[in-house]
Amino acid sequence: MMQDLRLILIIVGAIAIIALLVHGFWTSRKERSSMFRDRPLKRMKSKRDDDSYDDDVEEEEGVGEVRVHRVNHAPGNAQEHDAPRQSPQHQYQPPYASAQPRQPAQQPPEAPAQPQQRPQYGQPSQPQPAQQPAQPVQQPVQQQPVAPQVQSAPQQPVQPAPQQPAPQPAPQTFQPAEPVAEPAPAPEPVVEEAPVAEKPQRKEAVIIMNVAAHHGSELSGEVLLNSIQQAGFKFGDMNIFHRHLSPDGSGPALFSLANMVNPGTFDPEMTGDFSTPGVTIFMQVPSYGDELQNFKLMLQSAQHIADEVGGVVLDDQRRMMTPQKLREYQDRIREVKESNA
């Protein structure tokens, strides 16, 4: 997708550059042609200004009267002199009609016909033929407006000024390349969904029973230690006794025995010089092997110790153990096994 976008941008940029080059060549060529056209017009304008200036000077100096006398003596010659002056006007105007709109401002000085009428005071009959050639001079001037072909002048508005928009291609700096930041889709791998597959927590339970002395008495430490060892417990971790899978203390621990008095530990030196109100036997479910069989073994060990020390077996609330409480323990064990199955 990015390659297609880049290719399209490159093609569009190339087309824009070519268009700008063609437009530049076309405008420069047009400017040159307009410059060559304007030069002859400027020359014609300067010549006409000079002619009009000479005519004005002659009129002010009274040269007009001399022309009137010449017309009286040789009217044919006067016409010949006037005709060639008119002919260049016809020659210059048609090819460069674009300059004709400026002539109306210069035409008033070309009306020498009026000063020629001044000699009428002395010879009223003779100036008339002199006015006749002056009229054709005005007629072509009136016909000159036919040259409104000057409409070609609107071509001049095609000036280099329109080239100023050329800097507009600057926006074509391919700023769209900025979307290169599209690597943003990387967040798609939302691995957080993995926690959705949370495994159900493993249900656990602790079965507790106690062996305690009768009310108001305590168990002798020496007798208690002997009975614990006979039940297959071995002293071990956390300074308490553990019943392992094998009576010799090998294999995983099935259940444990702790002192009922805080902190619940026994003396590591295993001396019998102590007494205690009782001991606590507990089993964590699930455990190694068959939990129901382990519970039966735990119950047998508690009864054996109680018989040896002259105590009684109590439940987790330190009440007399009853058949209903035993069934409750067994139901709890089965519930844990089924929930973890």
UniProtKB/Swiss-Prot annotation:
Membrane topology: Single-pass type I membrane protein
Primary localization: membrane
Coiled coil ranges: none
TM spans (from-to): 7-27
One Pfam family of this chain: ZipA_C
Ranges of biased composition (kind: Pro residues): 157-170
Stretches for region Disordered: 42-199
Low complexity compositional bias, start-end: 85-105, 113-156, 171-181
GO cellular component, one term: plasma membrane
A GO biological process held by the record: division septum assembly
Cytoplasmic side stretches: 28-341
Ranges of Acidic residues composition bias in the record: 51-63
Entry keyword set: Cell cycle, Cell division, Cell inner membrane, Cell membrane, Membrane, Transmembrane, Transmembrane helix
Listed Gene3D superfamilies: ZipA, C-terminal FtsZ-binding domain (3.30.1400.10)
Compartments, as annotated in UniProt: Cell inner membrane
Quaternary structure and partners: Interacts with FtsZ via their C-terminal domains.
Family assignment from sequence similarity: Belongs to the ZipA family.
Function: Essential cell division protein that stabilizes the FtsZ protofilaments by cross-linking them and that serves as a cytoplasmic membrane anchor for the Z ring. Also required for the recruitment to the septal ring of downstream cell division proteins.
This protein's name: Cell division protein ZipA
Native species: Citrobacter koseri (strain ATCC BAA-895 / CDC 4225-83 / SGSC4696)
Gene from which this protein is expressed: zipA
